[in-house]
Amino acid sequence: MSLPDKAFPVSWDQFHRDARALAWRLAGLDQTFKAIVCITRGGLVPAAIISRELNIRLIETVCIASYHDYVNQGDMVLLKGIAPELAENGGEGVLVVDDLTDTGKTAAQVRTMLPKAHFACVYAKPKGVPTVDTFITEVSQDTWIYFPWDMGFTYQEPIAKGAR
C-alpha cells in the first residue's frame, strides 16, 4: 500500500484530547442526549470517551462498512441497523458519533435513519462537513488520517522528498 501525499497521523494521546474537546463542545450545547449511536468501527473509541464525559449510559451501534480495502471508499453496506426505540421520533435526543466524516456518505445514510439526531465527529473533511452538526478538526479532502488503532510503529518518510 502506498502512502498518500498528505498523511495526518494521530496518536492515542492526541485522539483522546480531541475526543474530550468534542465532549466539551457537546456539553456546551443546550441539549440533553438520552443515548449515543456510534457508527462502527471508527465511532467506538470516541463514543466511549464522550459517553464517560457526558455521563451517557445508553450506547448503541450502527454498523456500516464503506472502506473495504482501507484505502478507497466503496459501496455502503449496512451490517446492523439501529434499535427501533432509538429511531422513534426521528432519533430526537440521540447523539450520533463517528471518528471522521470524509465524503459524508456514511453520515448521510445514518441521517436517513435518525433525521432529528445530533451528529458529531472528531475529524471532518470538506465534503463531509455539511453532514455533521459538531466536529473538532478539519483536514483537507486529500489528507489521509491514520488513526492509532490502525497503526504500528514504523518508519515514516520525511515530508520533503529526498530529505534524509
Swiss-Prot record:
5-phospho-alpha-D-ribose 1-diphosphate binds at residues 41-42, 98-106. Mg(2+) binds at residue 99. Pathway: Purine metabolism; GMP biosynthesis via salvage pathway; GMP from guanine: step 1/1; Purine metabolism; XMP biosynthesis via salvage pathway; XMP from xanthine: step 1/1. It is a peripheral membrane protein. The keyword Iron does not apply. GO terms for biological process: GMP salvage; purine ribonucleoside salvage; XMP salvage. It catalyses: GMP + diphosphate = guanine + 5-phospho-alpha-D-ribose 1-diphosphate; XMP + diphosphate = xanthine + 5-phospho-alpha-D-ribose 1-diphosphate; IMP + diphosphate = hypoxanthine + 5-phospho-alpha-D-ribose 1-diphosphate. Guanine binds at residues 102, 145. It is found in: Cell inner membrane. It comes from the Bacteria. Xanthine binds at residues 102, 145. GMP binds at residues 102-106, 144-145. Gene3D superfamilies: 3.40.50.2020. One of its GO terms (molecular function) is guanine phosphoribosyltransferase activity. Purine salvage pathway enzyme that catalyzes the transfer of the ribosyl-5-phosphate group from 5-phospho-alpha-D-ribose 1-diphosphate (PRPP) to the N9 position of the 6-oxopurines guanine and xanthine to form the corresponding ribonucleotides GMP (guanosine 5'-monophosphate) and XMP (xanthosine 5'-monophosphate), with the release of PPi. To a lesser extent, also acts on hypoxanthine. NCBIfam families: PRK09177.1. This is Xanthine-guanine phosphoribosyltransferase. It comes from Rhizobium etli (strain ATCC 51251 / DSM 11541 / JCM 21823 / NBRC 15573 / CFN 42). The gene is gpt.
